[in-house]
């Protein structure tokens, strides 16, 4: 590896999420919130259970379902859509959007520690307002 984090033979830049540098494959990929993944997996599980020839769900599927159930921050489609809409209005990279919604940090300082790319891009007050808005949406979900 050459200094500066790039490999001169391939012309590729080394990925660094803290600088929002991702592999090319990620450029067109969309991010999902843990809550969205949970809803999709739950729907798939229900489809499977109602099918005539019910298939046994894989261990990986069940572990992922359990993980997303445990770490989902939002309980219904309306709240998920509302939070995503709120965050899409901000100048956030899709990675930052997903991280903020999945982690739900309480303070701007915590956000910047968990998501270093936010540092220098958002004032603490602006970031705190975003976090407070997310928390409000979480507290009013049913």
Swiss-Prot record:
GO term, biological process aspect, one: transcription initiation at RNA polymerase II promoter
Pfam families: RNA_pol_Rpb4
Compartment(s) of residence: Nucleus
Keywords carried by this UniProt record: DNA-directed RNA polymerase, Nucleus, Transcription
Signal peptide: none
Disulfide-bond pairs as recorded: none
One cellular-component annotation, GO: RNA polymerase II, core complex
Record flagged with keyword Nuclease: no
Record flagged with keyword Disulfide bond: no
GO MF annotations, alphabetized: nucleotide binding; translation initiation factor binding
Subunit structure: Component of the RNA polymerase II (Pol II) core complex consisting of 12 subunits: a ten-subunit catalytic core composed of POLR2A/RPB1, POLR2B/RPB2, POLR2C/RPB3, POLR2I/RPB9, POLR2J/RPB11, POLR2E/RPABC1, POLR2F/RPABC2, POLR2H/RPABC3, POLR2K/RPABC4 and POLR2L/RPABC5 and a mobile stalk composed of two subunits POLR2D/RPB4 and POLR2G/RPB7, protruding from the core and functioning primarily in transcription initiation. Part of Pol II(G) complex, in which Pol II core associates with an additional subunit POLR2M; unlike conventional Pol II, Pol II(G) functions as a transcriptional repressor.
Function as written in the Swiss-Prot or TrEMBL entry: Core component of RNA polymerase II (Pol II), a DNA-dependent RNA polymerase which synthesizes mRNA precursors and many functional non-coding RNAs using the four ribonucleoside triphosphates as substrates. Pol II is the central component of the basal RNA polymerase II transcription machinery. It is composed of mobile elements that move relative to each other. POLR2D/RPB4 is part of a subcomplex with POLR2G/RPB7 that binds to a pocket formed by POLR2A/RPB1, POLR2B/RPB2 and POLR2F/RPABC2 at the base of the clamp element.
Similarity comment: Belongs to the eukaryotic RPB4 RNA polymerase subunit family.
Name this protein carries in UniProt: DNA-directed RNA polymerase II subunit RPB4
Species whose genome carries this gene: Bos taurus
Lineage: Eukaryota, Metazoa, Chordata, Craniata, Vertebrata
């Amino acid at each position: 590896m050459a200094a500066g984090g790039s490999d001169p033979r391939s012309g590729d830049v080394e990925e660094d999420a803290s600088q929002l540098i991702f592999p090319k494959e990620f450029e067109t990929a969309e991010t999902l919130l843990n809550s969205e993944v949970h809803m999709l997996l739950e729907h798939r599980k229900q489809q499977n259970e109602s099918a005539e020839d019910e298939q046994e769900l894989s261990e990986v599927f069940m572990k992922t379902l359990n993980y997303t159930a445990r770490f989902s921050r939002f309980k219904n489609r309306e709240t998920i859509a509302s939070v995503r809409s709120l965050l899409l209005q901000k100048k956030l990279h899709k990675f930052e959007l997903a991280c903020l919604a999945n982690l739900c940090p309480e303070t701007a300082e915590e956000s910047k520690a968990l998501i270093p790319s936010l540092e220098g891009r958002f004032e603490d007050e602006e970031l705190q307002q975003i976090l407070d808005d997310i928390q409000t949406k979480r507290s009013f979900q049913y």
